[in-house]
């Protein structure tokens, strides 16, 4: 009887430790790239909802592309329903196409795709890509390239649902083999088949790749650029606004 009680106490203690670990995530916000379509398989849709719930369980807010359709709509709704903050960033031109019905959370309208990606990156502590098309792939590869260049050191996660990204991974391995991508840069991508496993890996992530340029050098260059591009005669208020817009994306 005492052995049984002791076992139960240990199990309860382990559950408390696990719950505390979830509450103490290193991330405040994670940016999720995903399709504006739901995809052919139900597993893609299930993964989007599951990812949203996993973010909620870890008290992490969502940054995403702002749409209410496709996988974007599913993951944002799951996070919002769980009581976490949602920030959607979307170009005004895409609003009629990617927003239908009621939106959730905070919607930031921007002028174009470049501003969208910069704002999403600026707001986030890490990145995750769900299945998606050209847009998702472009967003994913850009943050990978930025990490390789040393612009940021934020984790980049790939949720490889049902092997969706196997062909992309084969291409990257081929590029490493042909010496277009360095072996160390292959470690930029954090890979997992489920949201829970991916979040656990992202929490433990530490950069292992060789950066082309140190991050500090990028930041110093940016500060120098902001100062050199001041417009003579510009009012202080407007000058501060422009400099803020040129400020750190990441």
Curated annotation (Swiss-Prot):
What domain of life does the UniProt record list for this protein's source?
Eukaryota
* Top EC class of this enzyme: hydrolase
Q: Hydrolase as a keyword?
A: yes
Instruction: Give any single GO term for biological process.
Output: cytokinin biosynthetic process
EC number(s) reported in the record: 3.2.2.n1
Question: Binding positions for substrate?
Answer: 98, 116-117, 133-139
GO terms for molecular function, please? Answer: cytokinin riboside 5'-monophosphate phosphoribohydrolase activity
Answer yes or no on keyword Zinc-finger: no
Tissue expression profile of the protein: Expressed in roots, leaves, stems, tiller buds, shoot apex, immature inflorescences and flowers.
Which SUPFAM superfamilies has this protein been placed in?
MCP/YpsA-like
One Gene Ontology cellular component:
cytosol
> What keywords would UniProt list here?
Cytokinin biosynthesis, Hydrolase
InterPro entries named in the record: LOG (IPR005269), LOG_fam (IPR031100)
According to its UniProt record, which reaction does this protein catalyse?
A: N(6)-(dimethylallyl)adenosine 5'-phosphate + H2O = N(6)-dimethylallyladenine + D-ribose 5-phosphate; 9-ribosyl-trans-zeatin 5'-phosphate + H2O = trans-zeatin + D-ribose 5-phosphate
Annotated S-S bridges: none
What does the record give as the function of this protein? Cytokinin-activating enzyme working in the direct activation pathway. Phosphoribohydrolase that converts inactive cytokinin nucleotides to the biologically active free-base forms.
The text of the family note is:
Belongs to the LOG family.
Identify the NCBIfam families for this entry.
Rossman fold protein, TIGR00730 family (TIGR00730)
Entry protein name: Probable cytokinin riboside 5'-monophosphate phosphoribohydrolase LOGL6
